[in-house]
Amino acid sequence: RFKKIRRLGALPGLTSKRPRSGSDLKNQLRSGKRSQYRIRLEEKQKLRFHYGLTERQLLKYVHIAGKAKGSTGQILLQLLEMRLDNILFRLGMASTIPGARQLVNHRHILVNGRIVDIPSYRCKPRDIITTNNKQRSKALIQNFIASSPHQEELPNHLTIDPFQYKGLVNQIIDSKWIGLKIN
């Protein structure tokens, strides 16, 4: 994980750690001229590691985004940002995207009153995301929300009620709120 953030830069979804400033100097000395292939590969790897996707999942999202009207890159980022695991991370209900995936897989999360155990579930506007009524589920989410450093910088397309452990998807995400720098 740390080798990945040293090589690709900060990946907020993968870990809260940041690469040290000295590691950039080593990469610049080693790198030389970067080919177009290398630049595209690094950007693809950033997407994969940030969102926790396999190669096949990413290719499916690229295919869906290519068929849709509009900019393929923007639509791809919107599709990835509307995944349930990513929305939990953005709401502050999990510290990382892998942590959010675990919450979803362990059936702690309800979408519109139904248990969803698929992290790649595509949320739609006006979806209500809550925790299971079990005490363990509420305690887990409460700890994450209390320790969440980015509580005040919640994206416009999401709202959270920290006392009821409830999040709401208002609309599809605006491209300026995506925390990942993609070339």
Swiss-Prot record:
Location relative to the cell: Plastid, Chloroplast
Residues making up the signal peptide according to the UniProt record: none
Example of a GO MF term: rRNA binding
Origin: domain of life: Eukaryota
Annotated ranges, domain S4 RNA-binding: 82-143
Annotated SMART domains: Ribosomal_S4, S4
GO cellular component: chloroplast; small ribosomal subunit
Family: Belongs to the universal ribosomal protein uS4 family.
Self-association state and partner proteins as the record states: Part of the 30S ribosomal subunit. Contacts protein S5. The interaction surface between S4 and S5 is involved in control of translational fidelity.
Name of the protein: Small ribosomal subunit protein uS4c
Biological source species: Crocosmia sp. (strain Porto Alegre 034)
Protein's gene: rps4
